[in-house]
Regions:
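Tryptophan-centric aromatic hotspots in well-structured domains and transmembrane helices
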Residues: 3-6, 52-55, 91, 118, ...
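Short histidine/acidic/glycine/proline-rich micro-motifs that form metal-
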Residues: 73-74, 118-121
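Catalytic pocket-lining loop regions of alpha/beta-barrel enzymes
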Residues: 1-113
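Mid-to-C-terminal alpha-helical segments outside catalytic/metal-binding sites
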Residues: 101-102, 106-113, 120-164
């Protein structure tokens, strides 16, 4: 059995508690733990990143937790601003890189999987741009790491390795 969890970054400790209580349960943390950058967190991106990163590091210590990488908006800290053209994969990769690389470093490629989150994601970029951004972020990864990020980790998390 597996459990997909979508929650916000202040709730990440709850995933750790569930993972500790049920070590045989495969837990998949969706959307990089959804860092909140609006509402009461608006203008506090550096503080949010620091808090989120520490929580991701803590949750990643549980071997039964995997993480889905994606579902981040483009208009995050470092975003260039509104433009008449949609962002390309290079711009998306630049915006997402610090968040996704933090997750990959914490969980390792073997427990990290890319996710598209379409059709919701089309609000920020096209399907092709999203996946090309993932390819850009993965450019320095080994062939084995790329296999994990793009398919292997998901197959293990959902126990469907026989389909690869």
């Amino acid at each position: 059995m597996s459990l997909d969890c979508w929650l916000y970054h202040p709730q990440l400790s709850e995933v750790a508690q569930i993972a500790d209580a049920y070590p045989d349960l495969m837990i998949i943390l969706n959307h990089v733990g959804t860092p909140i950058l609006g509402g009461p967190y608006r203008g506090k991106a550096d503080e949010v990143f620091k808090e989120w990163k520490a929580s991701i590091g803590d949750v990643s210590k549980r071997d039964n937790v995997f993480i889905k990488l994606g579902a981040l908006p483009i208009r995050m800290p470092g975003y260039v601003g509104d433009r008449s053209l949609p962002p390309g994969s290079e711009e998306v990769a630049t915006a997402w890189r610090p968040w996704l690389e933090t997750c990959i470093e914490a969980f390792g490629p073997a427990r990290s999987m890319y996710e598209s989150n379409f059709p919701v994601q089309k609000r920020w970029c096209s399907y092709q741009v999203c996946w090309n951004a993932f390819k850009r972020i993965s450019v320095g990864a080994s062939a084995t790491e790329k296999t994990d990020l793009f398919a292997g980790a998901a197959a293990r998390a959902y126990r469907i390795e026989n389909v690869l």
